[in-house]
Amino acid sequence: MNKVVLSASFSLLAFAVLAGGPLDNAVLHGETDKARAIDYAPGEEMVFTLSLQGAEAFADGQYFVKWTRTGDDGAKEEGKVDAKSLPLVVKTKLEQPGFVRLEAFVIDAKGKTYTKSFTGNPNTPEGKKALNAFERKDKRVFFDGGAGVQPETLQSVPEPKDFDEFWAKRKARLAKVPMTATVKEHRSSNPSVKVLSFSVACAGPRPVTGWVTIPTDAKRKYPALITFHGYGAHFIQTIPDSGPTDKMHMFINAHGYELGREDEYYTEFYDALKSNGRTFGLDSSWQNKSTDTAYFGWMCYRIMRAMQYLKSFPEWDGKNLTAAGGSMGGLQTMWAAGLDLDVSAAQPSIPWCCDMGGRETLKRNQPNWGVGETEAMRYFDPVNMAKRVNPKCRVEITRAGLGDYCCPPSGISILYNNLKCPKKINWVQGSTHGYVPSEEHQKFSLTSDWE
């Protein structure tokens, strides 16, 4: 009898897991009373409305929404309401230019964060794909968004007085290193495209490494695209088997490691990059105290050399050169555009490290994780690079999240403000660094000289 009861209990438990909870397909939707959430004046009331969408029936007192308001003013407010009472209206204001952040998520009666369960069938090919995507997502039922006051007036701390002189010296140092390249051609699945991997000599401890795909039609010249990857403490670049037929496409890794090596090589490589226990670029106690030891300095050398190498290919049309990337890739995109005037278009998404002076000096709402503020880091701040972009270059910040506090909206606003060229920024309400709401949500764009 005991075995039967145990078996039945197990079956019920398995069914409960498969059945999931009433909020497994729900989203916590948030919006402001203004369609453009950055149009508030100092002291003007901001009204956020939060609602549950896609929820199944649940009881009073079963779930609650816990919310927190923070902002560039340093103020903090908190609250908790029964989820059955939604929609929830949160009213706040900001007396100065900057941003307010509103975070909210669902908890149960014991205060535990609600975590979604996968509701599909993992035994089908489509279900397996959906499960893999589900595992990479934030499983909370949450909203993380914000609103801004006069972001067009925001600025960072003053840039270093010798900013241009500093970079002129760096470029001169790079010029002394001959641009010798080791190139290997790889099998391409498309005979109209050739695939090359390369290692190019560079200033600093390591070369530039990556790959480039080039259309094989020798009768034409092509526009060029260079892309950069985001931060990853163990990112491994792989070589593609083809590429576009209408453009050259180069993709470099940030570090200059060898391509196609065994896993142990990359594990040892990334371990060796650590400084005082921090992964690359994050050690503010020593490495980032000086431009001579800052890891970003070596990355910038590699970007400048990669741009030179890309432009040396006879297949390039000599005029169309686009740089693109997200997060740390967005940071690298702005370095490329700020340090190479041949860049004709830049497409940074959620660009990292904007307004590095906003953390300590200006006391803005900044993340705990990331690059700390030092004077040396101001030479690498993309808000300063933005001022040097070619006035004819078209820059589109393809996504800026009002709830992204890995790359806070205040810093991205300053980047946009400092661009003196055709520019566009796409704001997304409820978007964090790695999340864009699946439901219909507020989004809007700002442009200047954009056609």
Question: Model segments located where?
Answer:
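Bacterial N-terminal signal peptides
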Residues: 7-16
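Short beta-strand element of the alpha/beta-hydrolase
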Residues: 210-212, 220-231
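A catalytic-pocket lid/entrance helix-loop region that shapes and gates access to the active site
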Residues: 272-277, 331, 349-380, 427
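The feature captures the conserved acid-bearing segment of alpha/beta-hydrolase catalytic domains
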Residues: 360-419
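Cap/lid segment of the alpha/beta-hydrolase catalytic domain
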Residues: 236-301, 355-364
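N-terminal targeting or regulatory segments adjacent to alpha/beta-hydrolase or S9 domains
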Residues: 21-193
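Primarily recognizes the serine-hydrolase "nucleophile elbow" in alpha/beta-hydrolase
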Residues: 236-238, 304-364
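C-terminal catalytic histidine-bearing segment of alpha/beta-hydrolase fold enzymes
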Residues: 410-451
